[in-house]
């Protein structure tokens, strides 16, 4: 079968229709975000940057779980990424959790 968003992107104007990709859920669904960026270049300007625990698959701090953020961010240009939103659903310690996620991303992006 075909993914619904492949159909949508194949049949809409690339300058008018863009997508927002949740990196954690795409990864969990065994969808490679970088492959999606290459298949639909410039169509993913918005990202949900979140992670899932390697064992429980529950939401985790960014950089501690299953998502390969280095490879994904290395391909940001191909995606057309303009903005990303850092999330952790049900964060047990929201301020500490988002601070840890921020610190991870800051180190990754400014290495």
What do the predicted segments below correspond to?
Residues 2-18, 25-111:
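Histidine-acidic metal/acid-base catalytic patches
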